[in-house]
Amino acid sequence: MDKLIITGGARLDGEIRISGAKNSALPILAATLLCDGPVTVANLPHLHDITTMIELFGRMGIEPVIDEKLSVEIDPRTIKTLIAPYELVKTMRASILVLGPMVARFGEAEVALPGGCAIGSRPVDLHIRGLEAMGATIDVEGGYIKAKAPEGGLRGANFFFDTVSVTGTENIMMAAALANGRSVLQNAAREPEVVDLANFLIAMGANITGAGTDTITVDGVKRLHPATYKVMPDRIETGTYLVAAAVTGGRVKVKDTDPTILEAVLEKLREAGAEITTGEDWIELNMHGKRPKAVNVRTAPYPAFPTDMQAQFISLNAIAEGTGAVIETIFENRFMHVYELHRMGAKIQVEGNTAIVTGTEKLKGAPVMATDLRASASLVISALIAEGDTLIDRIYHIDRGYECIEEKLQMLGAKIRRVPG
């Protein structure tokens, strides 16, 4: 397994381009299955999960055409099997997203129960209950979800999500696009990635209103037509590089991004002492060499502070002036990175769903291990400011969510290199 070696102490300075959002690209790729012709999706990030999703299509008999800029053309009319096999699905939770489109378009689906990051219990029961409300019959047996649409296809339904679920909202919204009649999704997720998926479906001819609010209305149509669509920028990648610059007292300009989908994070960075300027598709952060001030953070569904930025702000607080509380309300067991940061000298106490972080002027390089995607980003950030070398193991977690992380950090002046395991 590859490792990263980071020598701390370099102040980040420069410009980088932000990649397309993985959490938008994956549902959009799944949604191409709803179309009755070829669809082109552009601005895909070069990430393992994206490759896995494209490989899954290949296993189903679809042959995606990929160009060197990683835009992909998919023609779902060539599909030969409606099974998403375990060996592919086990590595990627987002594979559950093909369930709704396949049942809606082809009348049946068989999808292995998914794998992915080990964060708390992330049940798929909302997906199943939503499809059942639309008339599907579903059995879970042998580790597979087997779903069948009723005679005449899925029916529009009113469905209330007990808990806000991004992938649940996406799956049911996709299925509803081709259902007979109107579906109303209540307590729906409001994330920008849900809006991006809705915009893609609309580009193919779907009739959807309310995306970005907690009530989404979908009037089913008979068919979705070919379209070309560009995936939105990755707001979590954007935020991660801004925090990295803030921690090192540096300056960074991130381009090809969207400041309007990151307001809660930018607000906290300003609170930490960063000077932030924005344009239509760029954000610049400048710390002017100063040490950040500790901030209190509480994660909550969009538009509040995102859970996927929690770990990065623990790293910021770890070297900040003062003490900050980080409260995690979305996932359980999402403080695994704290025990690795302790090895670097961070002063963090975890009490239930709260981490109390007392800033220290210096962290020390140490061998550490990535436990999940965002936790690994926090280790990279802390390593940038630590004295000496930090060796980060199990970085395949990082590669699941960050495109070319070492190249981008090198462009900003970081001393970072990848070594084969």
UniProtKB/Swiss-Prot annotation:
Compartments in which it is found:
Cytoplasm
Where is phosphoenolpyruvate bound in this sequence?
Answer: 22-23
Query: 2-(S-cysteinyl)pyruvic acid O-phosphothioketal modification sites?
Result: 117
Residues at the active site: 117 (proton donor)
What protein name does the entry list? UDP-N-acetylglucosamine 1-carboxyvinyltransferase
Which Gene Ontology cellular component annotation is one that this UniProt entry carries? cytoplasm
InterPro entries documented for this protein:
Enolpyruvate_Tfrase_dom (IPR001986), Enolpyruvate_Tfrase_sf (IPR036968), MurA_subfamily (IPR050068), RNA3'P_cycl/enolpyr_Trfase_a/b (IPR013792), UDP_GlcNAc_COvinyl_MurA (IPR005750)
PANTHER family per the record?
Answer: UDP-N-ACETYLGLUCOSAMINE 1-CARBOXYVINYLTRANSFERASE
* Domain of life the protein comes from: Bacteria
Q: Do the record's keywords include Cytoplasm?
A: yes
Q: Which reaction does it catalyse?
A: phosphoenolpyruvate + UDP-N-acetyl-alpha-D-glucosamine = UDP-N-acetyl-3-O-(1-carboxyvinyl)-alpha-D-glucosamine + phosphate
Q: What is its main location?
A: cytoplasm
Q: Where does UDP-N-acetyl-alpha-D-glucosamine bind?
A: 93, 122-126, 308, 330
